Amino acid sequence: MAVEELQSIIKRCQILEEQDFKEEDFGLFQLAGQRCIEEGHTDQLLEIIQNEKNKVIIKNMGWNLVGPVVRCLLCKDKEDSKRKVYFLIFDLLVKLCNPKELLLGLLELIEEPSGKQISQSILLLLQPLQTVIQKLHNKAYSIGLALSTLWNQLSLLPVPYSKEQIQMDDYGLCQCCKALIEFTKPFVEEVIDNKENSLENEKLKDELLKFCFKSLKCPLLTAQFFEQSEEGGNDPFRYFASEIIGFLSAIGHPFPKMIFNHGRKKRTWNYLEFEEEENKQLADSMASLAYLVFVQGIHIDQLPMVLSPLYLLQFNMGHIEVFLQRTEESVISKGLELLENSLLRIEDNSLLYQYLEIKSFLTVPQGLVKVMTLCPIETLRKKSLAMLQLYINKLDSQGKYTLFRCLLNTSNHSGVEAFIIQNIKNQIDMSLKRTRNNKWFTGPQLISLLDLVLFLPEGAETDLLQNSDRIMASLNLLRYLVIKDNENDNQTGLWTELGNIENNFLKPLHIGLNMSKAHYEAEIKNSQEAQKSKDLCSITVSGEEIPNMPPEMQLKVLHSALFTFDLIESVLARVEELIEIKTKSTSEENIGIK
């Protein structure tokens, strides 16, 4: 019945001119053709499409059948013989139908699926889509629309993380990336071959450029890469990245020029639209490009060999900042790798303090601190700590001094502050061992820095448990200074400032320890009484109530806190003992001299 209906509609339309086809004819053709497909009359439908007499009708109306045919092809339960006929019908429709209508129809079909069906749809439709676009005159608009639609769908797919996931490619992203390169190549070649640089060719370049930058952001920003020595040829993302960077050069945007122009006042693009997009969207793409070139070494041979390590570091710091602002493990990891790659090219103590006037040279170490303190992944926390130390090592003395002040003022984390204080101690030690003192870690400059170290933020009421790492590091630094610097020499300026240190740090610390120990001892007593009654209870630590827990666990927490206070108290007592010994010894020496 469906076949007869379709033949009747076609017979009526055969006698009409193309411009006389009515909207009603299109609707009836679509309904009858769709029923033929649903009822399995595919052989008869194929004959109708192949009939030369129906060529004009198929050209104008046939695109309505593409959707039903494609949906049948995407169904895995069809017999092989049926699938073969569906493919023949589909190929004929692509060959015969109006390319403008086909383009929109194919893009709608690409947008329909979700989940794992996204890649199946794309892999099926890429080749026909390429064929259709090559028939159109306005290629720039068409390729732009197609690439944008394809990228939007691919960006919905999860990026495989491990080697096993990449090999399994459950969602088909890796296959799609490879197929997308093959889809795009003819249009890149068309740009290369067109020597006239017509307006249409320039527009095509721009659309390809947009696609390349979108691809650098997704999937390449989060994609993992094999080691080059390990199965490098089988790494789909390395292949995709290499081709995308190659496309950039081929369409007249070699990546060295692009990455070194990024962020400058001089505009990189010819069109305002691109300039606005660069400012808002392309930071991730540029960071991804820098990582691919400098860490993965993709097309690195195109870079000028004369670039200095300091220049490359300055260039990369903005991109590292972008990486560290993200939360994905793979993206943060890339930022750390790029930072390490850039820093290892530079000699220790050679990074001048003036570089810290550049915003990213301060925001990157602050970003490292955030990863160290907030990231849930231990390997990234440890790597960030190592990178912060490496960064400190590269700075000159004034740069180290400036960075220490900055991080002490901004980190708000006892462990980080303890780490900085240990670095300050190391710099003082190196300075005292030199024949010529380093002015940044001796005398007035050091005293100014010690003002940020040897004090309690809230005086005697400071939470000593929460600040225990910082306090212990500060006491150890003070003990070191008392031992190493004689009062008569006073190279560090410590002995001049000792009165202030005692008033601002040592005395409040004594009071705070007494208050804290009394509080925790009272809590231990309460917990022991609760243990006798075998009830759950709550305790207050640092002004906050700890959730209900068994009394045995509470006692462990409380005794651990008391142990920390005892440790601080013992170091404090030793520091005060050393001060007394040194002061007395100096007084006796001075009396002897007289």
UniProtKB/Swiss-Prot annotation:
Sites bearing N-acetylalanine, chain numbering: 2
PTM comment:
Phosphorylated on tyrosine residues.
Annotated stretches, region: Alpha-helical region with structural similarity to HEAT repeats: 2-553
Which GO terms of the cellular component aspect does the record hold?
Cul2-RING ubiquitin ligase complex; Cul3-RING ubiquitin ligase complex; Cul4A-RING E3 ubiquitin ligase complex; cullin-RING ubiquitin ligase complex; cytoplasm
Superkingdom of origin organism: Eukaryota
Q: Which UniProt keywords apply?
A: Acetylation, Disease variant, Phosphoprotein
> What are the GO MF terms of this UniProt record?
hepatocyte growth factor receptor binding; signaling receptor binding; ubiquitin protein ligase binding; ubiquitin-protein transferase inhibitor activity
Its tissue distribution reads:
Ubiquitous.
Instruction: Give the region (Important for interaction with RBX1) as residue ranges.
Output: 300-594
GO process annotations (BP) = cell surface receptor signaling pathway; epigenetic regulation of gene expression; muscle cell differentiation; negative regulation of cell population proliferation; negative regulation of T cell proliferation; neural tube closure; positive regulation of cytokine production; positive regulation of interleukin-2 production
The record's disease note says: Glomuvenous malformations: Characterized by the presence of smooth-muscle-like glomus cells in the media surrounding distended vascular lumens.
Q: How does it assemble?
A: Interacts with FKBP4 and FKBP1A. Isoform 1: Interacts with RBX1 (via RING domain). Identified in complexes that contain RBX1 plus one of the cullins CUL1, CUL2, CUL3, and CUL4A. Identified in a SCF complex composed of CUL1, RBX1, SKP1, FBXW7 and GLMN. Component of a SCF-like complex consisting of CUL7, RBX1, SKP1, FBXW8 and GLMN. Interacts with unphosphorylated MET and is released upon MET phosphorylation.
Its domain comment says: The C-terminal half of the protein is important for interaction with RBX1.
User: What is this protein's record name?
Assistant: Glomulin
Its organism's taxonomic lineage begins at:
Eukaryota, Metazoa, Chordata, Craniata, Vertebrata
